């Protein structure tokens, strides 16, 4: 798994790095939002810039993001985590983003709604096991991405009350009281 981490607290970043490397994850650590965006853009460019017979062309953007996960602190120097997430999702809306923050959960949840994309939150402090479990839980993220697409389709077709209720029944199993929520 390839993970980009933006965390301004050196000790926390070091803890993440050691734990993720023990799991054999390829981890890139940055200490601020500006560096995080630079690394993300560089990796994205590597994916989209191809050279054939000394001719350079840009391939169409892939749905395949350059990192499996971008793990962001919410409050960071230069550019905050929310603005980093906005920029990344504008480049690749399929990128999985997880906020790891001690910021007030309700305020953070309200803030990330403006992204209009699926992002995850893991509330600090948390155990390394909780972090690893969140990172490895790809199935829930994939299902929620699918539901996000379904919601966009629902908006486009102007559904009946009965159709909305049917969709709510499908979504109900994902309504959990875990320490982190998906938006």
Model-identified regions with their sequence ranges:
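Conserved acidic carboxylate
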Residues: 7
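Charged docking surfaces used in two-component/phosphorelay signaling
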Residues: 14-18, 22
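Acidic catalytic/metal-coordinating carboxylates
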Residues: 32, 80-84
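Active-site residues of response regulator receiver
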Residues: 73
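Receiver (REC) domain active-site loop signature in two-component systems and cognate sites
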Residues: 76
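Alpha4 helix (beta4-alpha4-beta5 surface) of REC/receiver domains from two-component response regulators
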Residues: 83, 90, 103-121, 128-133, ...
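CheY-like receiver
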Residues: 141-183
């Amino acid at each position: 798994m390839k993970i980009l981490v933006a965390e301004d607290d050196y000790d926390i970043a070091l803890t993440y790095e050691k734990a993720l490397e023990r799991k054999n994850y390829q981890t890139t650590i940055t200490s601020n939002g500006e560096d995080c965006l630079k690394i993300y853009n560089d990796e994205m460019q590597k994916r989209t810039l191809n050279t054939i017979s000394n001719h350079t062309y840009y391939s169409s953007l892939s749905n395949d993001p350059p990192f499996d996960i971008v793990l962001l602190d919410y409050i960071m120097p230069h550019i905050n985590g929310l603005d980093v997430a906005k920029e990344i999702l504008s480049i690749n809306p399929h990128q999985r983003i997880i906020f790891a923050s001690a910021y007030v959960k309700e305020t953070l949840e309200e803030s990330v709604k403006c992204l209009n994309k699926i992002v995850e939150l893991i509330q600090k402090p948390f155990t390394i096991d909780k972090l690893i479990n969140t990172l490895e839980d790809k199935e829930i993220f994939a299902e929620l991405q699918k539901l996000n697409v379904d919601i966009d389709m629902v908006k486009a077709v102007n559904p009946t009350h009965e159709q909305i209720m049917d969709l709510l029944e499908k979504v109900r199993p994902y309504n959990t009281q875990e320490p982190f929520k998906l938006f």
